[in-house]
Amino acid sequence: PAKVAKCIESLKNSCSLPVTIKHRIGVDEDDSFRNLNNFVRHVANAGADRFTVHARKAILKGLNPKQNRTIPPLKYDVVKKLKKLNPELLIEINGGFNSIDKSIKALGDFDGVMIGRSVYKHPLRWSEIDQKVYGINTKPKFASEIIFSLIPYIEKHMSNGGKSWDICKHLINLVEGIPKAKIWR
């Protein structure tokens, strides 16, 4: 906790932007709630503005990063307890949120929900989130509209020596489940 707190202090002293820390609920055998809460309190006292808590522990001895995203069990209850003990802190939860409904339900217990891979893998599934969470009545764009709107950006990237694939590879999932998706890919 002391090293991380020192980093947070340095960041806070060198910029005016909010500082967020993303962390797991534990590492290897160091996964007691007491240690987690102590870590968060220590870092909060150093000035962290927001905590994004991944609801899994990290197993550094024996699991690779990909395995660490699926094998350690999600423990939402641990993050919920952390928030209850620290209501003054901005705490958002991360890990395993793959639907808008599941995310909205979590907002009842946390200050936010971080959505990661699900948005990248299934972006159109998330196109109604602003409407469902904030009541903003926006019409979701079609994948083709999004892709065509990026052409000037891709052209600029290419004029600076980049390859179109640098950007296009991240658009493949936009066409998931639509007719003739293979043509777009």
Predicted regions and their residues:
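Alpha/beta catalytic cores of nucleotide-metabolism and tRNA/nucleoside-modifying enzymes
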Residues: 2, 6-9, 14-16, 27-29, ...
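A short alpha-helix capping/helix-coil boundary motif
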Residues: 16-21, 58-60, 81-82
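Short, structured patches in soluble enzyme cores that scaffold and shape functional sites
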Residues: 23-25, 52-57
